């Protein structure tokens, strides 16, 4: 191996040494030689270990090379030199640079990390680091992919040594974080075998973190975010500049700060979890993003741009559309009539690639992902074609590093895969131990879940990715945290757990450490936060010190366990390799690979295992990559396609086009990760390591999937390496699987490898579970109790952000007929603006606003008082003049007596007033006298606007008092003039007991329930809201309407933390807003149909809620039979559109009172209008007022449905709903009934009398003539068996015409009206009819008979007679 350790960073080039993964084996030179390590092939030679796991005591000479693999630098034997570019070159594909990272991990353990840290900056200084170096490093890393050598250091090596200049995987355990998919593959192949060669790519290899590039600039570190490269080199050296990415890697010696930085970076890169374990390597990589060594053009490119090679039109790269082929065609062919080429265009010289990309959508049934457009980014990831993606895999990753890259989304995806692969790399440490390749799946799963960590240090580390820089590191970290004043008992327990866990081998120890670290992470944030550097260093130390109680216990574990972990690691490596491969091949849908949590180990190869682990742990089998990432919890629900390959298509939404994962809880919000993954890192940061660690906790949070729901997340582990782990945990968290589930999956995964170990892992997992779950109650707002009912005093200000008035009024003004002369109830009136505005502009008879907040009701009354005009009386003026004198005296006294400074202003005002009063006193008197005189004069004079020539009445006749006559007698005086028609009451509309609803009366024609349902729901639960709906229905008169503006479910979440009661109710809600409609139209409530009045536009989309109108049936005596109360069991569909009316022939003057015999009773009944409605539930009440109204039905095309004026089942709104086609056919003529012209005029539908209710009552007065004024309409009956088809025989059809109805003189004062049965042509019709029972015909006939009999009997007869129309 050509190792050139140049002390100067400039010289530090990773030569392409032919180093093979052997170096990784060197890592085996952990304190306890791992039998497995030798498995890595030539690398096994400890002496050879490139990233030598320096013996704990050794401080390896820091190697100054741009790659800053701190481990390598530390490597005493210049093994790290492999990092040098040339070595890399020499190594060609076989560079064991990864080993360097591993060794440096050991070195770090030794404490050489500090040196490494120092060197790294120097390395950073080195200009020579360039893409080539990075590539070399990557190659080396790939070779080192085994990471076993590093693993040798109690798992420190690769992970711990992640700081190794070239060991991009420093924590990767030899996986080398192959950001570049191909590199990852190669590394997996080579690294796993330990002897495998890694192809040297001039391009940055995706699999490798090209740490070298980042000379150690913090800025650089951001660039290198790609694959969690941020993780600083083990030494922490790696990227001091990288913002502590190194620390995150926990390269043993990395400082906590760096670790935090790494975490952030890695989060940016999307490898937050990786950041911790592989952080060191990551850190380097992260540095490379903006390495000063690279000129801008030399920056890592996401990929080398691969020009398209497939031209469907036969063109080539310079003529993609094959336009040149048109030049050769005959002019005739080019003529406008025939533009198609005579022949298929010849193919361009550039041949189509032999491989045809086949993009398989994740959901074959929804290839364009239109059904669930949750996150375009994820979906695109799923669809990206493998070919495009595979290209320069590393480039993609790098792009991820670069926030500014346009394709960063894809990178992220890739990155995720890489991250998984990264995890795999870390797992790779174990992987180098490749001794037991058979366990790859288990290993991958192990890597996938931090829980597995105890078993597979490498794998588990991998899983924790960044959580535990290296198994050893982890162990140390656990110890250290223990030692390092674990701030939280949890962290202490974590360490203890690590100690307790008797991991059989150093690897096991590392795993234990990792476990401890995981625990730490699960431990409260403070622990995590407790100097991530320290933790990392401790981890490194632990790796070295495997002997430490925990570590020693781990070390004690049998070598076989070591092997197991090793195999697990190799499995992880394989998994990561596969993941990378997958990443490279966009076509593959790597759900698991997308799963960050699984750490990529589960990507392709750990599929099942990783999915089991990952699913339990939040990583492997999940669909959402992001979920897996630390962010996964946050954005868990948003990133569905993260795992999928992306397709670039004008149809398929491009990444980020749909929904960006919420960055809400990112503590690192300021730094926007280049990828969503970065969010995941932030998320991990958000979660306290402890919180993150316990999958259970996360699952708890998982319910409220967006992490933002859990307030504490942001607090914890923001800067701690644990936070990186938290990334892994996040995956776990993202998975809602319970810890137990995780344990089980872990057990299964490991079980294949080592049955004995599975229990350990499970116990480990359980331990994190023991840590208090995140399920803590959220922090409730201080003002939550005050505003628990949504009684915001500034609510109107929010509603009217973009309008001078409430946008809902625009909708109401299009349906004025719903309000005019109606008794209205406004539930939740707040400060009364809507109530007052409706009263002013829509002329209701009365409107009552109620609210549960007494203060708001008081303010509403004050607001109303503004509109109450108090007439000025002259007496008042005089009286005021006198008090001014008294006031003057009083004020003078006050001025003398009160010395309070705060009263000065008031006093001054008072004084001024008094003086003015005194001064102008006489003037006022004069003014009053003049005013009085002027008023007297005015009273004698006729004002111009009041002037009406006396000759006009003589010449043209008197002006008929139309208005007064049209007004119903009920409208006494100013009853519905504005200020007098508004009332406010303080009350809770939700009754304590449903039995209290029995006392409700039908007193309203219209109920407004605007933006109140959410607050009723949150405060009183499902039962309270249902009770409120029932009460609304009960309080509506027949034909009454409910205008409902319900908040959508998404808005509930924002208010669930107001009070503990609301929080609990929120958790228990099962009656979601999308079920309101069905419920209101169900027999339990009884509304007959609904109609959408409109959806107001508002700048705040939260206020753009549809306004629904629900109509209560018109229960005339005959209608009652069809009413829900009368026949509650009657099955009918939600939308009834069965009734239509034939032309209205109004007789007698305009008023119902003029309607013949009705007139006498009409006035008397008008007075009882409010009470009559109470009788609706009984078939008989005074007169058939509603009967008459029901006859007066609005045609189906009319947009509004006037209460009491139309049949409750009229189809006016149904025509537009759900393609319900109601054709009203007259069985007589078998033709489709259409309203006559007279019906098409709205005037024919509005009663001449003032109120519709009055009109109805008018009819009642006549005893039977319930339909006042002879305004009888023919009724179209619902179909029965005889008439249900247009072909119904004429006999039945004629029988259905009720001659009896016509004969009833009481009913038909205005003339005869006939009823025609309607045929419901749509099966979906929701007619009230008894649905298609054979008895329907008999039933209808029976009704008809009853009507005929009752029709003869006076008023009640008329009522009973009413019509079958309701039937």
Curated annotation (Swiss-Prot):
List all Basic residues biased stretches.
Answer: 78-92, 397-414, 901-925
This protein's record includes keyword Methyltransferase? yes
State where composition is biased (Gly residues).
1260-1271
Q: Residue spans with biased composition (Basic and acidic residues)?
A: 705-715
- Keywords, sorted A to Z: Methyltransferase, Phosphoprotein, S-adenosyl-L-methionine, Transferase
Instruction: Specify residue ranges for compositional bias: Low complexity.
Output: 60-74, 330-345, 488-515, 540-559, 676-691, 723-733
**Residue list for modification Phosphoserine:** 688, 1123, 1242, 1251
* Chain residue ranges for the region called Disordered: 1-107, 143-181, 323-355, 381-443, 468-559, 608-734, 894-927, 1150-1203, 1236-1281, 1345-1367
Which parts of the sequence bind S-adenosyl-L-methionine? 808, 828-830, 851-852, 988-989, 1010
> Which residues are recorded as modified (Phosphothreonine)?
1116
Give one Pfam hit by family name.
Bin3
Q: State the family it belongs to.
A: Belongs to the methyltransferase superfamily.
Self-association and partners: Interacts with bicoid/bcd.
PANTHER family reported for this sequence: 7SK SNRNA METHYLPHOSPHATE CAPPING ENZYME, BICOID-INTERACTING PROTEIN RELATED
Question: This chain belongs to which protein, by name?
Answer: 7SK snRNA methylphosphate capping enzyme bin3
Q: Which organism is it from?
A: Drosophila melanogaster
Q: What is the lineage of its organism?
A: Eukaryota, Metazoa, Ecdysozoa, Arthropoda, Hexapoda
Q: Which gene encodes it?
A: bin3
């Amino acid at each position: 191996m050509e190792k050139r350790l140049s002390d100067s960073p400039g010289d530090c080039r990773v030569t392409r040494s032919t180093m093979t993964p052997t170096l990784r084996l060197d890592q085996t030179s952990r304190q306890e030689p791992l039998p497995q390590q030798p498995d890595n092939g030539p690398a096994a030679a400890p002496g050879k270990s490139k990233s030598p796991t320096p013996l704990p005591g050794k401080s390896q000479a820091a190697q100054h090379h741009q790659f800053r693999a701190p481990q390598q630098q530390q490597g005493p034997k210049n093994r790290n030199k492999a990092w040098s570019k040339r070595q890399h070159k020499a190594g060609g594909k076989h560079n064991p640079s990864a080993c360097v990272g591993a060794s440096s991990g050991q070195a770090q353990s030794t404490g050489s990390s500090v040196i490494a840290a120092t060197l790294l900056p120097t390395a950073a200084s080195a200009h020579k680091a360039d893409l080539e170096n990075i590539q070399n490093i990557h190659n080396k890393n790939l070779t080192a992919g085994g990471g076993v050598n590093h693993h040798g250091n109690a798992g420190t090596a690769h992970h711990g040594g992640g700081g190794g200049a070239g060991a991009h995987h420093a924590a990767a355990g030899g996986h080398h974080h192959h950001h570049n998919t191909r590199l990852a593959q190669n590394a997996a192949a080579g690294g796993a075998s330990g002897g495998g060669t890694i192809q040297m790519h001039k391009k940055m290899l995706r699999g490798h973190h090209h740490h070298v590039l980042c000379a150690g600039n913090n800025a650089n570190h951001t660039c290198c975010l790609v694959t969690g490269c941020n993780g600083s080199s083990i030494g922490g050296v790696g990227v001091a500049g990288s913002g502590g990415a190194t620390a995150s890697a926990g390269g043993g010696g990395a400082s906590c700060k760096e670790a935090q930085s790494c975490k952030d970076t890695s989060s940016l890169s999307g490898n937050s979890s990786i950041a911790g374990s592989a952080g060191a390597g990551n850190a380097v990589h992260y540095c490379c993003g903006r390495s000063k060594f690279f000129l801008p053009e030399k920056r890592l490119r996401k990929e080398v741009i691969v020009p398209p090679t497939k031209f469907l039109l036969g063109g080539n790269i310079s003529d993609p559309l094959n336009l040149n082929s048109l030049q050769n065609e005959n002019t005739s062919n080019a003529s406008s009539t025939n533009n198609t080429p005579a022949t298929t265009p010849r193919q361009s010289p550039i041949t189509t690639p032999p491989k045809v990309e086949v993009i398989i959508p994740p959901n074959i049934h929804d290839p364009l992902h239109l059904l669930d457009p949750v996150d375009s980014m994820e979906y695109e990831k799923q669809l990206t074609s493998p070919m495009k993606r595979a290209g320069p895999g590393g480039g993609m990753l790098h792009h991820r590093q670069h926030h500014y890259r346009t394709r960063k989304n894809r990178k992220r995806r890739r990155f995720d895969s890489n991250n998984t692969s990264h995890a795999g790399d870390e797992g790779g440490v174990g992987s180098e131990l490749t001794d037991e390749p058979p366990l790859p799946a288990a290993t991958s799963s192990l890597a996938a879940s931090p829980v597995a960590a105890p078993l597979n240090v490498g794998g588990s580390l991998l899983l924790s990715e960044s959580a535990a820089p290296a198994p050893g590191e982890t162990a140390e970290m656990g110890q250290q945290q223990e030692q390092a004043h674990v701030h939280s008992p949890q962290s202490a327990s974590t360490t203890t757990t690590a100690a307790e866990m008797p991991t059989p081998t150093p690897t096991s120890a590392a795993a234990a450490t990792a476990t401890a670290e995981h625990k730490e992470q699960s431990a409260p944030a403070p622990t995590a936060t407790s100097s991530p550097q320290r933790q990392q260093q401790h981890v490194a130390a632990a790796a070295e010190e495997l002997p430490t109680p925990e570590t020693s216990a781990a070390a004690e574990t049998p070598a076989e366990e070591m092997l197991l972990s090793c195999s697990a690691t190799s499995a992880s490596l394989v998994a990561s390799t596969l993941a990378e491969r997958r990443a490279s091949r966009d076509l593959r849908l790597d759900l698991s690979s997308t799963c960050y949590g699984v750490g990529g180990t589960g990507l392709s190869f750990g599929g099942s295992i990783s999915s089991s682990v990952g699913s339990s742990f939040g990583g492997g089998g999940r669909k959402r990559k992001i979920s897996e990432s630390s962010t996964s919890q946050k954005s868990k629900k948003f990133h569905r396609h993260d795992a999928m390959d992306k397709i670039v298509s004008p149809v398929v939404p491009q990444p980020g086009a749909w929904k960006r994962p919420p960055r809400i809880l990112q503590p690192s919000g300021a730094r926007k990760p280049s990828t969503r993954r970065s969010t995941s890192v932030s998320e991990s940061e958000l979660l306290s390591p402890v919180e993150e660690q316990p999958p259970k906790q996360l699952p708890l949070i998982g319910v409220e999937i967006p992490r933002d729901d859990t307030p504490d997340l942001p607090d914890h582990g923001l800067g701690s390496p644990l936070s990186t782990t938290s990334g892994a945990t996040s995956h776990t968290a993202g998975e809602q699987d319970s810890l137990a589930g995780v344990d089980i999956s872990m057990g299964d995964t490991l079980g294949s490898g080592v049955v004995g170990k599975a229990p350990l892992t499970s116990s480990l997992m359980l331990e994190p579970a023991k840590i208090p779950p995140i399920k803590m109650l959220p922090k409730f707002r201080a003002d939550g109790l005050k505003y628990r009912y949504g009684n915001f005093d500034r609510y109107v200000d929010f509603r009217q952000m973009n309008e001078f008035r409430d946008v809902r009024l625009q909708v109401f003004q299009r349906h004025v007929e719903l309000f005019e002369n109606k008794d209205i109830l406004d539930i939740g009136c707040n400060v009364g603006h809507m109530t007052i505005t409706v009263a002013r502009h829509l002329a209701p008879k009365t409107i009552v606003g109620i609210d549960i907040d007494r203060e708001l009701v008081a303010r509403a009354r004050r607001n109303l008082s503004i509109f109450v005009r108090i007439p000025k009386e002259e007496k008042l003026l005089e009286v005021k003049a006198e008090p001014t004198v008294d006031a003057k005296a009083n004020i003078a006294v006050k001025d003398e007596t009160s010395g309070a400074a705060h009263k000065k202003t008031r006093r001054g005002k008072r004084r001024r007033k008094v003086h003015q009063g005194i001064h102008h006193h006489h003037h006022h008197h004069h003014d009053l006298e003049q005013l009085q005189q002027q008023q007297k004069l005015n009273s004698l004079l006729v004002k111009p606007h009041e002037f009406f020539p006396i000759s006009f009445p003589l010449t043209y006749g008197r002006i008929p008092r139309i208005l007064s006559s049209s007004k119903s007698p009920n409208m006494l005086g100013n009853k519905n003039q504005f200020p007098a028609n508004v009332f406010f009451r303080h009350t809770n509309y939700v009754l304590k007991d449903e039995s209290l609803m029995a006392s409700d009366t039908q007193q309203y024609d219209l109920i407004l329930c605007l933006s109140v349902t959410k607050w009723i729901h949150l405060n009183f639960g499902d039962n309270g809201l249902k009770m409120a709906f029932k009460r609304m229905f009960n309080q509506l008169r027949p034909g009454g309407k409910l205008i409902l503006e319900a908040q959508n479910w998404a808005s509930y979440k924002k208010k669930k933390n107001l009070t503990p009661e609301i929080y609990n109710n929120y958790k228990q809600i099962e009656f979601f807003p999308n079920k309101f409609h069905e419920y209101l139209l169900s027999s339990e409530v009884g509304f007959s149909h609904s109609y959408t009045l409109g959806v107001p536009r508002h700048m705040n989309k939260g206020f753009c809620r549809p306004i629904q109108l629900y109509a209560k049936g018109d229960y005339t005596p005959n209608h009652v039979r069809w009413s829900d109360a009368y026949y509650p069991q009657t099955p009918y569909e939600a939308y009834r559109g069965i009734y239509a009316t034939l032309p209205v022939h109004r007789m007698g003057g305009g008023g119902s009172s003029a309607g013949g015999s009705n007139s006498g009773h009409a006035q008397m009944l008008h007075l009882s209008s409010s009470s009559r409605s109470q009788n609706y539930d009984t078939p008989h009440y005074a007169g058939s007022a509603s009967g008459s109204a029901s006859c007066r039905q609005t045609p189906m095309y009319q947009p509004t449905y006037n209460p009491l004026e139309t049949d409750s089942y009229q189809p006016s709104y149904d025509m537009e709903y759900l393609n319900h086609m109601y054709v009203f056919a007259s069985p007589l003529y078998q033709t489709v009934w259409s309203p006559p012209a007279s019906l098409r005029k709205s005037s024919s539908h509005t009663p001449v009398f003032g109120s519709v209710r009055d009109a109805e009552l008018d009819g009642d007065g006549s005893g039977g003539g319930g339909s006042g004024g002879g305004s009888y309409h023919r009724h179209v009956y619902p179909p029965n068996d005889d008439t249900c088809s247009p072909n119904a025989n004429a006999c039945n059809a004629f029988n259905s015409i009720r001659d009896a109805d016509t004969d009833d003189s009481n009913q038909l004062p205005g003339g005869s009206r006939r009823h025609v049965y309607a045929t419901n042509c749509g099966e979906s019709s929701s007619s009230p009819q008894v649905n298609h029972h054979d008895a329907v015909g008999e039933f209808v006939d029976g009704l008809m008979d009853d009507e005929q009999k009752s029709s003869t009997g006076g008023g009640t007869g008329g009522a009973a007679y009413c019509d079958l129309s309701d039937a």
